Amino acid sequence: MINIAIDAMGGDFGEKPIIEGVLKALEAKPFNAILVGNSKILKPLIPKKLEQYIQYEEASEIFSMNGNATDALKNKETTIYKAINLLKEKKVDAVVSAGHSGASMSLATLRLGRLKGISRPAIATLMPNIVNRTLLLDVGANTDCKAENLFQFAIMGEVYAREIMQIQKPRLALLSNGEEECKGNELTKESHQLMKKIPNFIGNAEGRDIFNGEIDVLVCDGFDGNVILKACEGVATAIFQLLKNEVKQSFISKIGALLMKSSFKKLKKHTDWQEYGGAPLLGVNGCVIISHGKSDSRAIKNAIFQAINFSQSHINELIENELGKYNA
């Protein structure tokens, strides 16, 4: 059975939504959950029928959301340090954390190391499009990149899309300010030339192309990716609020909204980041899923499912093999 270490106390809302997410995941499929935190606080939250799937790793401190990621290595008593250490010692197959994302990334990179051929890891996230989903990377691990980094991101994203998203030939694109090969800054132009070696590379794409369903993997640096991610979260929230405001304007609008209630629910589910769980940190020697600090139990449950799928798919080995084809 898969062993998953969960940073049980690292999110914005404490241990309750995290434990609820673990329990929901266990009710759906069996796995061993290693809860990292204060067992005196955590044990009362576990029902007896699921106790057989739960173990505890004691950790006395939580890495502050206001802390500096560079300090993550200094305190070995934090929940995220101990969770990553379990993975390093191969006592677990994956780590899920809704704590400080910078600390998670720093610890994973420095404690686990990078995959062969990878110079920098990347955070990948799923974005809704009109057909299904688009994988966007990097969304925050690296604000400044070289062309070789973006090329490596492309390979990692392609493998992830093929193995986890089950897309046989994922369409891969590079974010730019125009579709033409000559568009973009020097980084984009140089990266484009490297990515032309990849058979599934379809060229440059603009920001709007994330949502048209014609791209499966979109590559960019962590600065642009994070701006896109946060902007999309804001736009989605604003659109639903505008719809609510308009519905309240008249009785006819309220009737129309009632008739479309089912469609609105489906739309909300498709665009809700909680449905996507977390973001895998690709390129490190292990499986680390970084969840949003504001994750509810549903997001934690889905992040755990991501971790299980990642662990069972042997993605890291496949990434190294794929990169080896180009480095030979």
UniProtKB/Swiss-Prot annotation:
Assigned protein family: Belongs to the PlsX family.
InterPro entries hit by this protein: FA_synthesis, Phospholipid_synth_PlsX-like
GO annotations of cellular component type: cytoplasm
Record lineage: Bacteria, Pseudomonadati, Campylobacterota, Epsilonproteobacteria, Campylobacterales
Name the UniProt record assigns to this protein: Phosphate acyltransferase
PANTHER family registered for this protein in UniProt: FATTY ACID/PHOSPHOLIPID SYNTHESIS PROTEIN PLSX (PTHR30100), PHOSPHATE ACYLTRANSFERASE (PTHR30100:SF1)
Function: Catalyzes the reversible formation of acyl-phosphate (acyl-PO(4)) from acyl-[acyl-carrier-protein] (acyl-ACP). This enzyme utilizes acyl-ACP as fatty acyl donor, but not acyl-CoA.
GO molecular function: phosphate:acyl-[acyl carrier protein] acyltransferase activity
EC number per UniProt: 2.3.1.274
UniProt KW keywords: Cytoplasm, Lipid biosynthesis, Lipid metabolism, Phospholipid biosynthesis, Phospholipid metabolism, Transferase
Localization: Cytoplasm
One BP annotation, GO: phospholipid biosynthetic process
Species this protein is from: Campylobacter jejuni (strain RM1221)
Subunit text: Homodimer. Probably interacts with PlsY.
Any Pfam family the entry gives: FA_synthesis
Involved pathway(s): Lipid metabolism; phospholipid metabolism
Chief location of this protein within or outside the cell: cytoplasm
Catalytic activity: a fatty acyl-[ACP] + phosphate = an acyl phosphate + holo-[ACP]
